[in-house]
Structures are given as C-alpha cells and as structure tokens.
C-alpha cells in the first residue's frame, strides 16, 4: 500500500505511564507526528509538562516537542481531536464501560483507535492483535465499520501485557504442532500496575501472590488471539487450554513466565532442538514488512545447555528496543511434555510498543488512510 509520508496522531491518556511511554516512542517516529495530547478534564488546558508534573516516570526527559503542548480534554473534545489527527492511541484510566463508550465515540467520529485498554478485547468484531501472531485478524475491520456505520473509524486492541511473556513462544510452535494444554505462572513487574518503586515502596523486598483479574485475562485472551474470523466476528479457539497463576514481583520492568506445556500428539512431539530452531527462525508479518518497531528477531533463544541462567530481565528486556521476546531453559518435563521460561518488556512489547507496532501494521495495510 502506498502510504502518506506522515500521519498525525493523538495520545488519549497522555499523562499516565503508558501514555508517557507512547510519547517517548513516537517522539522520533519515521511515520508519525504527535499532534494531540489528551487527558482528564483536570489536566486539560495545561501545558503537558505542568499537567504531568512529578508523575513523569520515564528515564528520558519530557521531549521538547511536547513539553509545552496544551493538553486537550479526552472526553469532551472528541470531535475536535478527531478532526486534528489521522488516528489515536488510547490508554486511559477509567471504568470499563466508560472506556468502551469513549473509544466508540472516537471511532464514530471517523478516527481509528489503537487501544491499550482491556474494554473492547472481547467485542467480537474488534481485533485483539499480537502483530507477529495474528495479523490476519485486521481483516475483521470492514465488518466492524459496518456495525459502527463508519467509513474509516474502527477500534483495534492489543492483548494484556502478560500474554506477550508466554503466548508467542507457544503460538509459534502451535502453528505446526498443536499444543493441548499448558500451565503458566507469571512474575509481573510493578510498572504493569502503573507504579515505580518510588510510588509503591511496599513492593521493595516483597512479592504479592495476586493481581486482580489478571489470571482470568491470561487464561481467556489467548483463545481470541488464536481464534478465526467467521462471518462478522472472531470466534475464539477452544484448542489450547491454559491455566495460570500470577505474581507481582519486585522488578521495575519486564514480565517473566514459567511455562509447562503438552502437545495434542505427544507421541510425535518435536524435539527441543526443533522447537528452539522454530523460535529462532520465525519471522512474522512485521519482520517481513520491516515495520519501524518490529524487532529484527522476534524470539531470542537461550539453551539450557549453554545459558541455563538466561533470560535475565535486566538484559533481556532491552533487546531490540524492548520489542523482542526471550525464551530459555526448554527441557523435558515429567508431568508435561516440556517446561521452559519466557520473558518480555511489559510496557514496551507488552503495552505502548506493542500498540505502536499494531498501528504500523494497520498503516502499512492501508487502514489509516
């Protein structure tokens, strides 16, 4: 598709942690220019640097290009914002039904929405996409536009940030050798709760064995990602059963998962080497299209023989701008076919970076024109 040289974008929820991450990612983007920053009514009308103030949690400074930008009202300026931009990224902290309604208002104002929120993840005609795994789900968008009565407006969402740490590893193998069931335990960073050690001192030297709603999301959402378009909806898969337990751990960024899994046909399961080769060689559509935020190698592999103490969060989370997945310790299991570990950067691959990559996929395929 012949694209425009530049697309104007808005960030809805610009003062929150994911919103801040969007700003740093889009600041020097080759295709996109930040045109609008929007947040709650209490931030509206202020310069961005004053609205965000001490809440700025990124390592880098607030980019000069947005520091003095006047923040718009995310809920009351929908039509104004829609006129100014080609599409918006949305990461707001509101009640679920309010988010659902807000995102539909933007879509109906003919402004595509790439959402980091969970509100529309189970709307049957809203694609929930990990760009390397199920890019074909964008083909549901014409059906969604028909329902919304729009020409170009639509909503596309990314999955929960925990999924990136375990689903890619299984999904790539599942394409060739169907996996039947898996047991997953996730060890999730505090930035997933929008916090830092400064704002959540209780997490220092602590571990919380519970994250509200997270286990259900982690078990249910993979079914939609692995589902198929049938008629005017995405029908979730019922093939791969995942059981999950989630922990909040004292780590700033990066979600890790311990995974036990078994194949439908265990007698003819692939070898450890074969699985590791599938991971290392896998190229998805983002790699084929060479999208700006696509990691050169989607899955980085550490073998049990050569690097049993890898992947470690501190080093692995930064690979390819935080967009790569790292897998290691693949070995035979006594109760399952195999066991392994996998990790990803939860606010880059798992949140803002994954949403930017999804926007790039949609742009390259002509959905933003």
What are these language model-derived features?
Residues 8, 17, 31-82, 181-186, ...:
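C-terminal substrate-binding/catalytic lobe of Rossmann-fold NAD(P)-dependent oxidoreductases
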Residues 319-369:
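NAD(P)-dependent Rossmann-like dehydrogenase/reductase catalytic/cofactor-binding core
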């Amino acid at each position: 598709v012949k694209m425009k040289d530049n697309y104007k974008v808005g960030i809805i929820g610009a003062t929150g942690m994911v919103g801040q991450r969007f700003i740093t990612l889009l600041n020097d983007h080759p295709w996109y220019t930040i045109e609008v920053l929007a947040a709650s009514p209490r931030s509206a009308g202020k310069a961005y640097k004053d609205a965000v103030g001490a809440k700025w949690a990124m390592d880098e400074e607030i980019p000069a290009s947005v520091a003095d930008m006047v923040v718009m009202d995310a809920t009351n300026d929908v039509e104004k914002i829609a006129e100014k931009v080609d599409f918006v990224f949305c990461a707001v902290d509101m009640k679920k039904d309010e988010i659902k309604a807000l995102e539909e208002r933007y879509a109906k104002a003919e402004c595509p929405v790439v959402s980091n929120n969970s509100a529309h993840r189970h709307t049957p005609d809203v694609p929930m996409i990990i760009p390397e795994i199920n890019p074909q789900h964008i083909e549901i968008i014409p059906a969604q536009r028909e329902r919304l009565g729009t020409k170009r407006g639509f909503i596309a969402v990314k999955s929960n940030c925990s999924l990136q740490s375990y689903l890619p590893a299984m999904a790539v193998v599942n394409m060739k050798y169907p996996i039947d069931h898996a047991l997953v335990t996730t060890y999730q960073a505090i930035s997933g709760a929008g916090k830092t050690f400064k704002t959540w001192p209780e997490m220092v030297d602590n571990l919380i064995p519970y994250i509200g709603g997270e286990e259900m999301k982690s078990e249910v959402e993979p079914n939609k990602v692995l589902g198929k378009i049938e008629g005017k909806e995405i029908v979730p898969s019922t093939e791969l059963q995942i059981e999950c337990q989630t922990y909040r751990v004292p780590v700033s960024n990066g979600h890790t998962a311990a995974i036990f899994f078994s194949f439908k046909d265990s007698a003819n399961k692939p070898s450890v080497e074969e699985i590791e080769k599938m991971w290392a060689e896998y190229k998805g559509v983002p790699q084929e299209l060479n999208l700006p935020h696509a990691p050169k190698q989607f899955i980085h592999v550490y073998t049990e023989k050569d690097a049993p103490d890898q992947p470690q969060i501190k080093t692995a989370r930064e690979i390819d701008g935080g967009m790569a997945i790292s897998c290691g310790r693949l070995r035979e299991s006594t109760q399952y076919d195999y066991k392994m570990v996998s990790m990803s950067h939860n606010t880059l691959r798992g949140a803002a970076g994954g949403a930017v990559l999804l926007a790039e996929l949609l742009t390259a395929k002509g959905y933003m024109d």
